């Protein structure tokens, strides 16, 4: 098992981990990631799946849980269908939504103090831009046998670890690393 303690999530750490995984003889059929933009470039030679759960969470943060605009409510409903759609159906529905709301999304508001304009519905435009960026990676799991569409299983394994770290937030770095090492040692002896 590859294990490295990092204080920040960096692309170079992912590159190092992937190189180690391949060096010890594993073949990487595909990678599920949760949205770090630079990883798409780093893993360009691999089949990459954007975690559908994280995609929905990104859009939900931009729209809020209860969008007040009809365009936002429609986009929220479209995102709710993501995990049960295939690439063609979801893409067609998204493009139809974008065409329907195109002029609305281009509306601009004038700042009365400066006279400059900005997009009126910035958060909705941002949600749309995120979907456009990640769309090529949302259905890779259908092309790779056994690849999941989310990283929820892996996230679930780490729930206990995160809870323990949060419950002991005053731990020194060395103690935190010892806790993490013990977690992975136990996990390695009892794989899930």
Task: List the model feature ranges, each with a label.
Residues 26-43, 73-192:
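Acidic/histidine-rich catalytic cores and adjacent linkers
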Residues 5-8, 33-38, 53-58:
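An acidic- and aromatic-residue-enriched active-site/binding cleft used to recognize and process polar
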Residues 45-67:
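Inter-helix linker motif
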Residues 19-24, 40-53:
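Short, surface-exposed basic-aromatic patches at helix termini and helix-loop junctions that form
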Residues 68-72:
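Ligand-binding grooves and catalytic loops that recognize ribose/phosphate and carbohydrate rings
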Residues 14-18, 63-66, 173-176:
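Surface-exposed beta-strand edges and their flanking turn/coil or helix-capping segments
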Residues 2-26, 30:
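Active-site beta-loop-alpha junctions of metal-dependent nucleic acid enzymes
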């Amino acid at each position: 098992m590859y294990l490295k303690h990092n204080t920040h999530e960096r692309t170079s750490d992912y590159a190092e981990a992937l190189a180690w995984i391949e060096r010890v003889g594993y073949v990487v059929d595909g990678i599920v990631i949760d949205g770090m933009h630079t990883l798409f470039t780093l893993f360009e030679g691999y089949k990459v799946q954007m975690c559908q759960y994280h995609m929905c969470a990104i859009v939900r943060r931009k729209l809020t849980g209860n969008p007040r605009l009809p365009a936002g409510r429609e986009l929220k409903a479209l995102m709710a269908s993501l995990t049960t759609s295939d690439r063609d159906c979801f893409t067609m529905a998204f493009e139809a939504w974008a065409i329907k709301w195109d002029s609305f999304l281009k509306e601009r508001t004038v700042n009365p103090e400066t006279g400059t304009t900005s997009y009126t519905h910035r958060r909705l435009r941002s949600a749309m831009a995120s979907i456009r960026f990640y769309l090529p990676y949302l259905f890779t799991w259908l092309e790779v046998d056994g690849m999941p569409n989310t990283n929820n299983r892996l996230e679930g394994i780490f729930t206990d670890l995160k809870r323990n770290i949060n419950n002991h937030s005053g731990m020194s770095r060395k103690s935190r690393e010892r806790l993490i090492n013990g977690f992975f040692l136990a996990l390695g002896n009892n794989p899930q």
